[in-house]
């Protein structure tokens, strides 16, 4: 509907603590503010995902923002109904939270290099990542299957930080350089065909226990071609046992131990013309945001970005879509509808493959098998992208 221009304009501002910087011991932090009726959504600067917001009155709002440990410079953007940014405000919130034991949702297995090519077998490694806002105490956290290793007492892992356990420290340093966060060495080797990897807390509680594989739909490029397995969306509390949670690393040569190989939407957008999120500059039917996820160029019309489908003899459908390898925290799920109004994840969808495509930028093609709902006269499918 039209905006009521009789309503006096209200500048977009953060009002918590009078807009002044402050400290807190909890995360997420709730920020309050004010804004005008033309605001459709509020998000963190550089993000494409709206924050969950509550409008407490016609022109006042609240949002919850997760914090990392220490100072957090938070810049919020107000986005109107055309997708334009109509206001920004910033505040620094310092998280004074303490040290916590790891949980399955806060300590993830973020990268696995299980089958290096040729004579590089001794460069194997496993990477852990802290996805929380607190420092994690990894004292006596231990791998009990796949590899054998216990973290020494006093091992701490800061928010967003990564830690590596490696097969051979000398071989690892020769391959990847010095200065990486190596916690220690495991005496055995990872299976080249995949196996169970199990990580337990000091009290014996299982943090993660899952089987990875070298067979589809697991990324086959990690099986001897020099790529690692990378957890695609580590901040989403992903199911490590689900092959859809993983992708092959951006490059061969062992992946990116100790670091991310993703590119944020904000950085990609700035490097590609900084067009509005919902703008289709090249007229190929895909917005700037969709070009990022699909692996396109917002200035080059590319019909190859369109999802494909094929009807199988038994009445099932094969549908596939491309995904930019470096899309940060990108998940993709098929959704179905019988009337184009209500959409839902398809519980019967079978994930079949995740194959790296030739060319640049690096793009994977994900393929699923869908079964039409029984008795449905019509059946529609689409893909949902997002963190």
Named regions from a protein language model:
Residues 20-27, 115-120:
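Short, solvent-exposed loop/linker segments at the N-terminal edge
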Residues 1-19, 26-27, 34, 208-210:
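Middle-to-C-terminal accessory/interaction subdomains
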Residues 255-387:
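Short, composition-biased motifs enriched in small/polar/acidic residues
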Residues 27-31, 122-124, 315-319, 330:
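Structural beta-strand segments of beta-rich domains
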Residues 70-74, 193-195, 377-381:
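Exposed beta-strand face motif in extracellular beta-rich ectodomains
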Residues 28, 32-96:
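Long, low-complexity serine/threonine/glycine- and acidic-rich segments characteristic of extracellular
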Residues 59-63, 163, 364-368:
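Short strand-edge motifs at loop-to-beta-strand transitions and within beta-strands
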């Amino acid at each position: 509907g039209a905006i009521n221009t009789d309503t006096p304009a209200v500048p977009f501002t953060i009002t918590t603590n009078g807009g002044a910087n402050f400290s807190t011991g909890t995360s997420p932090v709730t920020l309050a503010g004010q804004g005008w009726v033309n605001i459709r959504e509020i998000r963190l600067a550089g993000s494409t995902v709206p924050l969950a917001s509550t409008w407490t009155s016609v022109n006042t709002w609240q949002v919850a923002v997760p914090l990392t440990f220490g100072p957090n410079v938070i810049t919020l953007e107000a986005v109107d109904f055309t997708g334009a940014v109509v206001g920004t405000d910033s505040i620094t919130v310092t998280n004074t939270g303490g040290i916590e034991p790891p949980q399955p949702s806060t300590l993830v297995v973020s990268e696995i290099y299980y089958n290096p090519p040729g004579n590089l077998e001794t460069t194997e490694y496993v990477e852990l990542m802290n996805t929380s806002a607190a420092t994690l105490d990894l004292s006596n956290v231990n791998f009990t299957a796949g590899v054998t290793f216990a973290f020494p007492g006093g091992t701490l892992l800061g928010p967003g930080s990564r830690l590596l356990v490696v097969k051979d420290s000398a071989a690892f340093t020769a391959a990847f350089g010095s200065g990486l966060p190596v916690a220690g060495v495991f005496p055995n080797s990872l299976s080249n065909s995949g196996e169970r990897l199990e990580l337990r807390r000091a009290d014996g509680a299982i943090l993660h226990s899952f089987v990875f594989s070298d067979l589809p739909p697991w990324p086959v490029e990690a099986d001897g071609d020099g790529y690692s397995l990378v957890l695609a969306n580590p901040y989403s509390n992903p199911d490590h046992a689900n092959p859809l949670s993983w992708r092959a690393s951006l490059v061969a040569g062992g992946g990116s131990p100790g670091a991310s190989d993703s590119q944020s939407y904000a950085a990609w957008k700035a490097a590609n013309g900084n067009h509005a999120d919902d703008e289709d500059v090249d007229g190929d039917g895909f917005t700037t945001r969709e070009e990022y996820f699909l692996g396109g160029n917002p200035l080059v019309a590319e019909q190859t970005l369109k999802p494909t489908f094929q009807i199988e003899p038994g009445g099932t459908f094969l549908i596939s879509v491309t995904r930019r390898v470096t899309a940060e925290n990108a998940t993709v799920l098929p959704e179905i509808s019988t009337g184009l109004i209500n959409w839902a994840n398809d519980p019967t969808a079978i994930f079949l493959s995740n194959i790296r495509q030739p060319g640049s930028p690096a793009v994977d093609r994900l393929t699923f098998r869908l079964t039409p709902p029984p008795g449905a006269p019509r059946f529609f499918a689409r893909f949902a992208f997002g963190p």
